[in-house]
Amino acid sequence: MTLRSLADIRARAADRKGGEAALAALLPTMKTAAELAAIPDDRWLSMMSRCVFQAGFSWKVVETKWPGTEAAFWDFSPARCRAMSDEEFDALLKDSRIIRNGAKVRSVQNNAALVMDLSAEYGSVGKAVGAWPADDFIGLLDLLKKRGDRLGGGAGMMALRFIGRDGWVTSPDMVKALVAEGVMDGNHDSQKSRKAIQAAFSQWSAEHGTPFAHISRILAMSVD
């Protein structure tokens, strides 16, 4: 794939944001594989759940309710959430501490099962995510989509970003930039486009070792 250099794209983004220093200050800090591996499984379930609840809803409301949500879901203990009874599910739908959306409440139980399964397979969710190769980030997204509940698309990508795993987020501005760079058409969910995004990010990252998360933000900030 013939791509414009990341340096050129970064220069455009820097011009739009007031200079290189201003741009650099807007780039996220990502965790190492060892740091990700050290994150307990309950914090992974908490972040997954938070991003599921935020999807299509006011993030400010979710943030305000989150301490109560943590308490209502037993501090997101995977084993406890997985064992949620029908009676407890019904009680949660009446609990004013949380956002009472039945499908999202049920996703906590289902994603607790995912967390426990990954922990059994890899030693912990953090070990699984931290060791996942960068050149197969789409494979990690596929895992969340296929084996998780409501973790396809934005929720899964945002959970990984917020917890510190390097990767991209297909925000509207980043998609616009990828289309402008000729990487893909507007349908970023197709298998063809996802493979093209992976190839482009791997190529750009190879130029100077730039993390995917930085490339993602640089692209998003390079367009009007």
Where would I find each of the regions flagged by the language model?
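Alpha-helical ds-nucleic-acid-binding substructure associated with the helix-hairpin-helix region
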Residues: 74-150
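Short coil/turn segments at secondary-structure boundaries
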Residues: 64, 106, 121-127, 213-220
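Short helix-capping/linker segments at secondary-structure and domain boundaries
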Residues: 55-61, 115-123, 183-184, 223-224
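C-terminal accessory module of base-excision DNA glycosylases/AP lyases that mediates lesion recognition
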Residues: 1-29, 129-224
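Non-catalytic, well-ordered alpha-helical scaffold segments
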Residues: 42-46, 67, 102-109, 138, ...
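N-terminal polyanion-binding entry modules of DNA glycosylases/AP lyases
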Residues: 1-101, 105, 218-224
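Alpha-helix N-cap and coil->helix boundary residues
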Residues: 61-64, 83-84, 120, 169-173, ...
